Amino acid sequence: DEGGCGCNECWPWGARGFPKLCKEFSCIARDKFPGIEIVLSTWMFDTPYAGEWEGLSKILSQDKSWTNYIMADSHEDFPRYPLDKGVPGGLPLLNFPEISMWGQSPWGGYGANPLPSRLQRLWNETENKISGGFPYSEGIYEDINKVICSQLYWNGDRPTKDIVREYISFEFSLSVVDKVAKAIDILELNHSRKHIDSSAIEAFNLIEQSAQNLTQQVRESWRWRILFLRALIDREMFITKGKLEGEILKKAFNELTAIYHAENSHSMPIHPPVIQ
């Protein structure tokens, strides 16, 4: 994120103070850990525009020996500069998918947050120019998103929906792939807590029906529980018109809290909602 004091020695941060400090840190790290590889993050560069990408490109055109990779991404669309004008220094490009906090708060507070369509769209934007990445993870609730990103790094031509189907087959059962995959599509459509529609009822019914074909071990696994609870919470929030109230929601949030071992967490962003 942005840093520096805003003086002429620091600003614009991404084109002056930041690369200057990173170059020094790179030298220290390589001295202490020979063979280490350096990834230079450009998170939030030119947000708003400040000439950071151009400045970094100029610096790395003169000397790129102190870093091995450029990592780029944003909260929404992938940054256009490295795609349209080339990666600074001609270095390999990594992404930094925001798979945890996007579109919901508290993060993970409603259970699983599968985003296969969003991740497919963002991957398509990178035009096969990505050499790997570092998904930003805040917890186990984005397990499906982690698997999607990992598989795209392995085979970028594979559709995310196909990855989800394999995930369901491996983690749950081949017999429930169709129903659970459809439920996950609905959960993504209802990702925003302000726009949960009647399809939430169908998603929960599909998950509940699928549970009947699973072994007890799978039904009690945390991966299944966070998906089941997300479907249940969405259904209840549709019924309550978004109000966090009622015994069903209270029990669901309490179970999520226990699964996350978040009973003693200090603040709401990392703790599911609490209903007294």
Please annotate each region the language model reported.
Residues 1-174, 261-265, 269-272:
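Catalytic-core regions of glycoside hydrolase
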Residues 137-142, 157-276:
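C-terminal non-catalytic alpha-helical accessory regions
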